[in-house]
């Protein structure tokens, strides 16, 4: 079990970072040394409709759930956008569906094939399959989906929110390291190792 640190950050008034640091993980994907741990990145957009951008690995699920419920402040979760099926992005999807059974799961065609491979008997009541250039309006925020296969895996997509000009980049532009441990670290050096 992970010792994770709770982090909630305002990206803007309506977009919140609800990810979790995991400072006890030694090897990412059982092969990459991560002496500074990792951060599992997840965001929530609070508009007329709410959208969760990715979930987190099961190791950080309890803290992420607390972050999410705090950020929602009693509101319903309308959408979850699954940009990447790797467990550090989608590992808590089944728990999210338990919490919000009517949530709409948003992904591309490959995402839904992989969901059924990763989760046995997952009960998705509502789903939305998106393709290149499709949009999803949340109110004052509009999400545009851009396919990015093999940024890491074949189903990867990124999501652009046009009103605030925010790119949710899945595994693109990332690096290893828990945010709480690497706040003042040399970003470029670790990013080079990641890529």
Outline where the language-model segments fall.
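Active-site environment of divalent metal-dependent phosphoester hydrolases
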Residues: 85-90, 112-115, 152-153, 174-177
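Metallo-beta-lactamase
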Residues: 10-13, 107-195
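Short, flexible loop segments at the rims of nucleotide/cofactor-binding pockets, characterized by
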Residues: 28-33, 56-58, 82-84, 143-149
């Amino acid at each position: 079990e992970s010792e994770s640190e709770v982090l909630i950050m305002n990206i803007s008034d309506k977009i919140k970072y609800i990810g979790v640091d995991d400072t006890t993980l030694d090897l990412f994907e059982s092969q990459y040394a991560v002496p500074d741990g990792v951060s599992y990145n997840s965001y929530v957009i609070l508009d007329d409709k709410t959208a969760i951008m990715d979930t987190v690995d099961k190791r950080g699920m309890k803290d992420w759930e607390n972050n999410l419920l705090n950020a929602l402040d009693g509101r319903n979760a309308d959408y979850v956008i699954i940009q990447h099926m790797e467990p550090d992005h989608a590992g808590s999807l089944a728990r999210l569906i338990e919490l919000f059974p009517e949530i709409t799961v948003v992904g591309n065609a490959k995402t839904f094939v992989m969901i059924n491979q990763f989760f046995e008997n997952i009960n998705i009541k509502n789903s939305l399959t998106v393709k290149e250039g499709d949009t999803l309006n949340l109110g004052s925020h509009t999400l545009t989906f851009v396919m990015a296969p093999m940024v890491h895996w074949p189903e990867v997509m990124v999501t652009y929110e046009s009103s605030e000009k925010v790119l949710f980049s899945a595994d693109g532009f990332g690096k290893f390291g828990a945010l709480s441990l690497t706040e003042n670290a040399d970003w470029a050096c670790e990013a080079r190792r990641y890529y």
